[in-house]
Swiss-Prot record:
Gene3D superfamilies: Cytochrome Bc1 Complex, Chain C (1.20.810.10). It is a multi-pass membrane protein. One of its GO terms (biological process) is mitochondrial electron transport, ubiquinol to cytochrome c. It holds the Pfam family Cytochrome_B. GO terms for cellular component: mitochondrial inner membrane; respiratory chain complex III. It comes from Phyllonycteris aphylla (Jamaican flower bat). The gene is MT-CYB. This is Cytochrome b. The lineage of its organism: Eukaryota, Metazoa, Chordata, Craniata, Vertebrata.
Length: 379
């Protein structure tokens, strides 16, 4: 008799995705981050659901409702800090997942890669709107600054901003509409994840060597299920440690002050995971130019597959490209640091140099280095 998991209409979909899925035998721990992102998304949706039961999206009560969750709701503080730090963990896994894709040439699966870029935009939008909801000082001023960037769009910019605000500044209507969108977007993200996996399973996974692994496949279960569970345990331990020992480590102290439109914080900045893009935005004196650079800092990833000039897929056997990749990581860390600094000398010039280097590495140096490597290998 055939196993029910192979015949049942629903179970056979799960079976072909997580049980009998053929996977390359050489996948390293860098391939764990996809499943870790799935766990992060599940944690965020569950904690967010319970937080939404107690939260009120009204400017008069939003800040107090978050305080009420932390003080009066049973384990409400755990939910709140799991959700806030879960977002940080989500972005750590997300950036490592993208880095893995760049290093090992996974971007050559263009459909999967492009859906991934859409996912990144959706997750960033979700995180931004979530940051506004506690209605602290940084929530209010962050929302004001970031939404105001849309006014740089010629002709329709100001109308668009006021349409999003629901008034002439960030008001009650803005908070009220951000809440349902913040609630809805994670489910759209979950749907996009399904499409992402659908395209991935059309081609099968890449592997560290970048060489087709069709002759050497193993079943996903039990080999990679066990490996993924170990990853879950490590990540959840790290998240729990952060939540229980230093929940405010990655937050901004200004957000413990209720939003006040009359007092501007000395230094407005987004959450740490947006600082690299914020630094690129600030490095261009022109408003429209800055906004374009901000969008392109993410969209540039879509151009990477078109600029792949190497005869090899992975960087595993390409030391020059490896050096360039780690230089790119250093540039991104520098941008993250600069994004959190005030707009003054020498931070301005460091940010401008790092921004130029970021685009140069991805668009010029990497393709040229690949051509040099091909020549050195006489290909």
């Amino acid at each position: 008799m055939t196993n029910i998991r192979k015949t049942h209409p629903l179970l056979k979909i799960i079976n072909s995705s997580f049980v009998d899925l053929p996977a390359p035998s050489s996948l390293s721990s860098w391939w764990n981050f996809g499943s870790l992102l799935g766990v992060c998304l599940a944690v965020q949706i569950l904690t967010g659901l319970f937080l939404a039961m107690h939260y009120t999206s009204d400017t008069a009560t939003a800040f107090n409702s978050v305080t009420h969750i932390c003080r009066d709701v049973n384990y409400g503080w755990v939910l709140r800090y799991l959700h806030a730090n879960g977002a940080s963990m989500f972005f750590i896994c997300l950036y490592l997942h993208i880095g893995r894709g760049l290093y090992y040439g996974s971007y050559m699966f263009t459909e999967t890669w492009n859906i991934g870029i859409l996912l990144l935009f959706a997750v960033m939008a979700t995180a931004f709107m979530g940051y506004v909801l506690p209605w602290g000082q940084m929530s209010f001023w962050g929302a004001t600054v970031i939404t105001n960037l849309l006014s740089a769009i010629p002709y329709i910019g100001m109308d668009l901003v006021q349409w999003i605000w629901g008034g002439f500044s960030v008001v009650k209507a803005t908070l009220t509409r951000f809440f349902p969108f913040h609630f809805l977007l994670p489910f759209i993200v979950a749907a996009l994840v399904m499409v992402h996996l659908l395209f991935l399973h059309e081609t099968g996974s890449n592997n560290p060597t970048g060489i087709p692994s069709d002759p050497d496949m193993i079943p996903f279960h039990p080999y990679y299920t066990i490996k993924d569970i170990l990853g879950f345990l490590i990540m959840l331990t790290a998240l729990s440690t952060l939540v229980l020992f230093s929940p405010d480590l990655l937050g901004d102290p200004d957000n413990y002050m209720p939003a006040n439109p009359l007092i501007t914080p000395p230094h407005i900045k987004p959450e740490w995971y947006f600082l690299f893009a914020y630094a690129i935005l600030r490095s261009i004196p022109n408003k429209l130019g800055g906004v374009l650079a901000l969008v392109l800092s993410i969209l540039v990833l879509a151009i990477v597959p078109l600029l792949h000039t190497s005869k090899q897929r992975s960087m595993m056997f390409r030391p020059l490209s490896q050096c360039l990749f780690w230089f790119l990581v250093a540039v991104l860390l520098t941008l993250t640091w600069i994004g959190g600094q005030p707009v003054e000398h020498p931070y301005v010039i460091i940010g401008q140099v790092a921004s130029v280097l970021y685009f140069l590495i991805l668009l010029v140096f990497m393709p040229l280095t690949s051509i040099v490597e091909n020549y050195l290998l006489k290909w």
